[in-house]
Curated annotation (Swiss-Prot):
PANTHER family: DNA MISMATCH REPAIR PROTEIN MLH, PMS, MUTL, DNA MISMATCH REPAIR PROTEIN MLH1
Functional summary from the UniProt entry: This protein is involved in the repair of mismatches in DNA. It is required for dam-dependent methyl-directed DNA mismatch repair. May act as a 'molecular matchmaker', a protein that promotes the formation of a stable complex between two or more DNA-binding proteins in an ATP-dependent manner without itself being part of a final effector complex.
Gene Ontology CC terms: mismatch repair complex
Source species taxonomy: Bacteria, Bacillati, Bacillota, Clostridia, Thermoanaerobacterales
Gene (UniProt): mutL
Source organism superkingdom: Bacteria
Annotated Pfam families: DNA_mis_repair (PF01119), HATPase_c_3 (PF13589), MutL_C (PF08676)
Family per similarity comment: Belongs to the DNA mismatch repair MutL/HexB family.
CDD domains reported in the protein's UniProt record: HATPase_MutL-MLH-PMS-like, MutL_Trans
GO biological process: mismatch repair
InterPro entries noted in UniProt: DNA_mismatch_repair_CS (IPR014762), DNA_mismatch_repair_MutL (IPR020667), DNA_mismatch_S5_2-like (IPR013507), HATPase_C_sf (IPR036890), MutL/Mlh/PMS (IPR002099), MutL/Mlh/Pms-like (IPR038973), MutL_C (IPR014790), MutL_C_dimsub (IPR042120)
UniProt source species: Thermoanaerobacter sp. (strain X514)
Membrane-spanning intervals of the chain: none
Protein's recorded name: DNA mismatch repair protein MutL
Keyword terms, alphabetized: DNA damage, DNA repair
Amino acid sequence: MNKIHLLDEKTINKISAGEVVERPASIVKELIENSIDAGSKNITVEILEGGIPYIKVSDDGCGMNEIDAILAFERHATSKIKSDNDLYSIGTLGFRGEALASIAAVSHVTLQTKEEGALFGTKVVVEGGKVVEKTTCGCAKGCSIEVRDVFFNTPARRKFLKRPSTESMYIIDVVTKLCLSHPEVSFKYVKDRKLQFITSGNGNIEDVILRLFGNEVYSSLMSASFESEDLKLKILAGKNSLNYSNRNMQFFYVNGRYVKNKTLSAAVDEAFKTYIPVNRYPAVFLYMEIDPRQIDVNIHPSKLEIKFSDERRIFEAVYKTIKDSLHKYNLIPEVKIEEKKNIFEIETPTISAEQTKLYLTSSDKELEEEKKKFDNEFKGKNVFLKDNVLKENSKNSSLDNHLAVYEEYEHEKEEINKNDLAKKISDIRIVGTLFSTYIIVEKEDVFYIIDQHAAHERILYEKFTSQYEKIQTRQVTFPIVVELQPRDLELVHQEKELLNKLGYVFEEFGNNCIILREVPVILGQPEARQLFIDIVEKLKDKELINKISLKEENIIMMACKAAVKAMDNLSEKEIHKLFDDLKITENPYTCPHGRPVIIAITKTQLEKMFKRIM
């Protein structure tokens, strides 16, 4: 007897449905995408109990005639493409012609649709993949699809569905992503007969973000854009103070389609690398328009993953666009001091559907004023420091020993900024230090607290970055032997050029050992064996070694090791120097690890705490 046999049509349909319809949220996604492709301006989504017993999606799109309404339930019947050549320039959300057939194979579906100008609409009822009713009906232009009893004929699949509340969460996630992808469409979402939200459909993505995520996310957004002949980017990214433990607040859209792509994620991570702490992720809403021929969306039935023909170009465009926006905005976090309330007095905040719109994009004049804000931050009155506020303690200072090393570097900066530096030094008022770790500075009605280690780390990081191509090395008096595992030895030889650029000159010594002949000099001190081992460990951690990222990580490591530490007592001279160096850095807001360098507290906030003002 033959072991291989052909499957019947019913079984084939159920298998195919399993690829498209994973859960009720999959149905909602496919139906909304069909509505968008039909040119709808208003889409309503209604669900009951997580969408398992009932889903309805209605729209005011182009609608269908009687013949198309029947064909729509046939597998691989579509209006989106006509031949295989169209696969290379897909401009719609759907194109396979599998959605309705797959949904109808595992549920009861009722379709009502009417074209513009038609006297009557068409009603089609499909159960388990079979058309059981086809009649004319009265209905509005567009399309309305009801889906009942999902997986009624595949109990094994239904058994693996989660609780209705969990399935509802999956659905709201899908609806949210589609709302963000098409701000020109008004979405209405009704769950268990209760209206959840309505978007305006006015085409303003910032308005959609405000409606869906509230003012905290909206008010922290930075806007950036990029445009070339065949690539257009709009990115709304949250400031570094708004970050999360996962990527759930990162939304990438390519030609109107929500996608996941490692290149886009990597570009965002790299741009924010020294602005937010490790293992934290920013909020990002990224919109890309690109020639469809430069992307491949035909990778998976969900069409969630895409590939770019030129990944490097996309990475560089996204990275540079975000990085430029980070340089334009004031990123000093302001401490929010909230008054404690009796638990019985706390009111639950509500967000009105008619919220006043906040405008995100500033005028050029406002942006220029914002950029000047930090430059003028410390131009307060001349105040002489009291002798007992700061103690001269050169003997215990780790920074004092490094001043001579900066002599040449500082001379170059002074030639450019000599008068400006002198003015800044005379204008600032350093109040003192706290816990031998934090420097307190006053300026008019604001005082700033600066983490001395984070500040020095930022200064050194930018110095080392600028001098990366000409790292100073020193021959060691006695060769340093480093024993490596066989795999590590192979890796060291493979990355010899990179290690040479980082200041390490070595040769093989036998028995899985190498000899370090030259090592990098950091702040006058040779960094030898341990730093080399740390670099090798970093190399091992990389599945695909990103040379730019690795270089940056090792510069961060060197800056961290060389920077003044918490509890190091700094002299008045050293504090002035540290502060003036910080003010001319490219990013004075965070250390290379993303921790804040400086925070602000206003006089008004203090007066509220002491009840001077109410």
